[in-house]
Every structure is written in C-alpha cells, then in structure tokens.
Amino acid sequence: MKIPFAQIDAFATRPFTGNPAGVMPLDAWLDDDVLQAIAQENNLPETAFNVPDASGAADYELRWHTPAAEVALCGHATLASGHYVLGADPTRDKVTFRTRKSGILTVERTTTGYALTLPAWFAVPKPLPDIAAALAIAAPLATLWHDSGYALIIVEDEAAVRAIRPDLYALLKLGPIVAIVSARGTTADFVSRVFTPYFDIPEDPVTGSAHAVAIPYWAAQFGRDTMTAYQASARGGHVGCRLAGEQVVLTGTCVSVIEGVFSLA
C-alpha cells in the first residue's frame, strides 16, 4: 500500500523555518496503531491524516499524531493540511475539517497565505508551581491553566522568554501538558515558546493550538482583538492573531518541502 505524503513547513516563508508537518490523505482510516507507527516513522512534530468526510458535515475528517500519541488539536498541521488541499486546486478558497475533539476547523485562502480558525481556549488563573519550577521560572507574572492540558506562564519580557532553559525531564514527569511561556514582545506584540516533552517534542517550533490559549489572554491585556505573535524557537515563526468571539483566527503561510509516497509493506 502506498500513501501520498507531503512534508510542509507551516507558519513559514521559506524552508527550514516554521513547524514541519506530515500530511497524508487516506481513502479510509487505517488502524490506530498503524497511524501511530507512521507518525513515529515520520518523526515530525505532527503527522496529519485526513479522509473524505462521509457525514457531509465537513470536507474531510482530520486526525493528528505526534511520534508518541494522538492529540486533540494541532494548529500547524491543520494549516499544512489546508495548504495541501487548496494548493492542489487553485479555484478553491476554503476547506473544512471535522475533528474528533475540537469541532470543525476551517482553512481559507487569503491574499497573503491562509487563515486558520480554531476554538478559543480561555485559560483561567491557577497556581502552577511545579510547571514553573520545571521551566526554571522563579517569579512568573501570571500562571493560567486550560483543562485541555495547556499551561500559560507569563514572564517579564521577550528576553526572558528567549532565555528559558527548561528541565525537560521534570516537565516530562508532570504528564501530558503543553507548557507555554509568553511575554510582551519587541519583534511582535507577544512572543512565546512551547515545551511538550511528554509528546516526544521537547520544544515545538510553532504551535497553533498554543495560540488558541495565548490569544484570549493577550487580547484582554492589550484591549484589542488583533495582534501579531512570534514563536521564538530555533526555527521560529510569525503568526497573525485575531480573537473572534469563541474562536481564534491564525494567519500564516506554508512551504512544501517534500512530496512523495509512504510505502506500507
């Protein structure tokens, strides 16, 4: 069995930046253990699998796997999946994906790239001393939590975000959490870094789902709904951000870097 495969850098303007994702269209779902084995073989932060949506609720069903596990939401691999579908049909301007735990997601073509609509995840203030300690943050300005397993830790400035040197083993022992460190930025309205060692991703390069948590917080801080963001990983990536009620809209571009087939014996 041969499966079409593309590796796409999302939230990127050139190769080797943004966040790489595998995109693999299927005619029907393979067994869960096969999907996980493929994602492990790809060894990318995420591999996105899609099949035509027989329910008619959306164009495709969409699932995401890291090398370690299936996840409930992945923004950058959804943007990459939209790029894959819309790039194959220049007459098409929008594609919808039905997900198992995050509702229906939309990717639309814009004049400069793509717009991805995700649910807005409103985090609430909560003491997170173990997570802050694992991140080597002695005195965070604020700590917030969303029950999807996302921690948002606010620090004083962009330099502090860039200087973070986490204890990844300590973070791993805390379980399936996504740890976001964020601050007001100089290169953008706000900057972030994201650490997810439980999912075999020590530091995620550019994380769409993390912005579903960060955007509502920063919209309240800035008193406006439209912002710019930069994820200050080694690869780095710019994200346009807008809070739209119970949703967030992320804008960015994608670059296809590999196309081929994945062979299953």
Feature locations, PLM:
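Active-site proximal loop and beta-alpha junction motif in alpha/beta enzyme cores
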Residues: 1-73, 79-265
